[in-house]
């Protein structure tokens, strides 16, 4: 996928920033197909998947959604997240550009550990923590989400879940679980073409949509 993106950029068909914007637009466009939630909770990791998440957050906020972003690795852009952790967003990337745009347009960010503060209700959770590059165990990253989710479920919340490209906790290339409890998505919005993991997700009843973001020649 990265080779395809690099080829599209080298050919002048799109910039990385344009591709990220299109990806976020595709995810945001999928949301109206579901019952309208009261609240969108967007989870952003430190890479390009997280950059997509910041685009989604901005676009949903522009449609008058109440949007709360919870993130990991973005302390340089959002000092309120606390001391930097071991994994941080790389300066100069398109993801950082979109995180700053979210901040500059009035958006805020809270640490993942604050997720349990969200009151139970009608909630859309957008998973943009890890994307196609994930290959390592990620239980620690997902633990705050599952702690919050279990509380919402006990309180009778109506929770809908959407993952950007690949649910956090799965290897994109072989579908192997990288966490004891990978993120459970109702819908996955992927880009350009399905990845090997999507066959496993479909077999488990997950809806997978593939969006055209202009990578074809």
UniProtKB/Swiss-Prot annotation:
Transmembrane segments: none annotated. (6S)-NADPHX binds at residues 48-52, 131-137, 165. SUPFAM superfamilies: YjeF N-terminal domain-like. Signal peptide: none annotated. The keyword Nucleotide-binding applies. Binds 1 potassium ion per subunit. It catalyses: (6R)-NADHX = (6S)-NADHX; (6R)-NADPHX = (6S)-NADPHX. It is an enzyme of class 5 (isomerase). Its cofactor is K(+). Its EC number is 5.1.99.6. Keywords: Isomerase, Metal-binding, NAD, NADP, Nucleotide-binding, Potassium. One of its GO terms (molecular function) is metal ion binding. K(+) binds at residues 49, 127, 168. It comes from the Bacteria. Residues 1-217 form the YjeF N-terminal domain. The keyword Metal-binding applies. Belongs to the NnrE/AIBP family. Catalyzes the epimerization of the S- and R-forms of NAD(P)HX, a damaged form of NAD(P)H that is a result of enzymatic or heat-dependent hydration. This is a prerequisite for the S-specific NAD(P)H-hydrate dehydratase to allow the repair of both epimers of NAD(P)HX. This is NAD(P)H-hydrate epimerase. It comes from Cereibacter sphaeroides (strain KD131 / KCTC 12085).
């Amino acid at each position: 996928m990265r080779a395809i993106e690099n080829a599209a950029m080298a050919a002048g068909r799109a910039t990385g920033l344009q591709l990220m914007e299109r990806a976020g637009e595709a995810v945001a466009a999928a949301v109206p197909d579901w019952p309208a939630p009261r609240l969108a909770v967007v989870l952003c990791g430190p890479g390009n998947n997280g950059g997509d998440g910041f685009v989604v957050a901005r676009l949903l906020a522009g449609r008058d959604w109440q949007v709360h972003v919870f993130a990991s690795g973005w302390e340089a852009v959002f000092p309120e997240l606390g001391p930097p952790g071991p994994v941080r967003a790389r300066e100069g990337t398109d993801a950082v550009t979109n995180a700053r745009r979210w901040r500059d347009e009035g958006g805020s960010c809270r640490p993942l550990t604050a997720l349990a503060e969200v009151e139970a209700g009608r909630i859309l959770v957008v998973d943009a923590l890890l994307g196609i590059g994930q290959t390592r165990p990620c239980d620690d990253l997902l633990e705050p989400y599952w702690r919050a989710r279990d509380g919402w479920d006990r309180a009778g919340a109506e929770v809908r879940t959407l993952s950007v490209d690949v649910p956090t906790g799965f290897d994109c290339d072989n579908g192997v679980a990288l966490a004891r409890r990978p993120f459970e998505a109702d819908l996955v919005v992927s880009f350009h073409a399905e990845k090997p993991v999507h066959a496993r997700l479909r077999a488990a009843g997950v809806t997978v949509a593939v969006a055209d973001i202009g990578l074809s020649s």
